[in-house]
Amino acid sequence: MSKQKHSASSTRWLKEHFDDKYVNEAKKKGYRSRAIFKIEEIQNKDKLLKAGMTVVDLGAAPGGWSQFAAKVVGEGGRVIACDLLPMESIAGVSFLQGDFREEAVLNALLDRIQPDMVDVVMSDMAPNMAGNLSVDQPRAMYLVELALDMCRQVLAPNGSFVVKVFQGEGFDDYVKAVRDLFKVVKIRKPDSSRSRSREVFIVATGYKG
């Protein structure tokens, strides 16, 4: 029985993953994923999260961003997380598993948020990549449009939004749409984001409501 060969790209990814200082640091500190360092760096620069805030985390699993947000907002705050994938419980985080494009799931998510409005909407959502840019980019842009639509539904005036976006077709139009809704918009590329990745993070503050 022959061993299944890894593709060159998957072999490279595996090597990068296990050599990655952020992966190793996350394990050492008991963090859910290396993604926590991205939101930590954004927080250090932009101070989006504060004690007592209500936060929605879209595409939350395995929970790195929720874990970080819960620590910052503290017992007086709330983190409501949603993902298609399961996520182990985190203290201070209310997790809903499901697809919020479905009415029943969206209503359940809104029920957990209301009657409050949300101070910060976070989205680290990404599609399952097919390795074909013409397929992957529209899927990725569709998800970030959903995240922006969530802002329109639940974000309080002067609230903030942080979203992972992949540069490519539709990116410039999306940035313009975010600028139409927020007073200040910045584009961040955290040190912990792999240099060859097309991902950047749009950080938007001062929701115009």
From Swiss-Prot:
GO terms for cellular component: cytoplasm. Its EC number is 2.1.1.166. Pfam families: FtsJ (PF01728). Transmembrane segments: none annotated. It is an enzyme of class 2 (transferase). One of its GO terms (molecular function) is rRNA (uridine-2'-O-)-methyltransferase activity. The active site is at 164 (proton acceptor). S-adenosyl-L-methionine binds at residues 63, 65, 83, 99, 124. CDD domains: AdoMet_MTases (cd02440). Its main location: cytoplasm. Belongs to the class I-like SAM-binding methyltransferase superfamily. RNA methyltransferase RlmE family. Specifically methylates the uridine in position 2552 of 23S rRNA at the 2'-O position of the ribose in the fully assembled 50S ribosomal subunit. This is Ribosomal RNA large subunit methyltransferase E. It comes from Vibrio cholerae serotype O1 (strain ATCC 39315 / El Tor Inaba N16961). The lineage of its organism: Bacteria, Pseudomonadati, Pseudomonadota, Gammaproteobacteria, Vibrionales.
